[in-house]
């Protein structure tokens, strides 16, 4: 999955590009409002726990992703 139609890359000083608003690429996953819905499915089979959205990976452009400190990882990506 590419954020902002592929317009999110690494800008100057190894910080994330402005195409996606820096670290705010996923407004619903901001640090101050991060929530997880937990669903327990219990039946005759062994109990398993599933977390909503757990299958979502980290968006990356050309092998580069926005790190937790709003810096590109790795810093050499363009």
UniProtKB/Swiss-Prot annotation:
InterPro entries: Metalthion_15p. Keywords: Metal-binding, Metal-thiolate cluster. GO terms for molecular function: metal ion binding. It comes from the Eukaryota. Signal peptide: none annotated. The keyword Metal-binding applies. It holds the Pfam family Metallothio_2. The keyword Membrane does not apply. Metallothioneins have a high content of cysteine residues that bind various heavy metals. PANTHER family: METALLOTHIONEIN-LIKE PROTEIN 2A, METALLOTHIONEIN-LIKE PROTEIN 2B. Belongs to the metallothionein superfamily. Type 15 family. This is Metallothionein-like protein type 2. It comes from Actinidia deliciosa (Kiwi). The lineage of its organism: Eukaryota, Viridiplantae, Streptophyta, Embryophyta, Tracheophyta.
């Amino acid at each position: 999955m590419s954020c902002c139609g592929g317009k999110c890359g690494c800008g100057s000083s190894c910080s994330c590009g402005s195409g996606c608003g820096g670290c705010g690429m996923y407004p619903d996953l901001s640090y101050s409002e991060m929530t997880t819905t937990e669903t327990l499915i219990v039946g005759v089979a062994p109990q398993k726990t599933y977390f909503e959205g757990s299958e979502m990976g980290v968006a990356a452009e050309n092998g580069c992703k926005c790190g937790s400190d709003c810096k590109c990882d790795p810093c050499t990506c363009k």
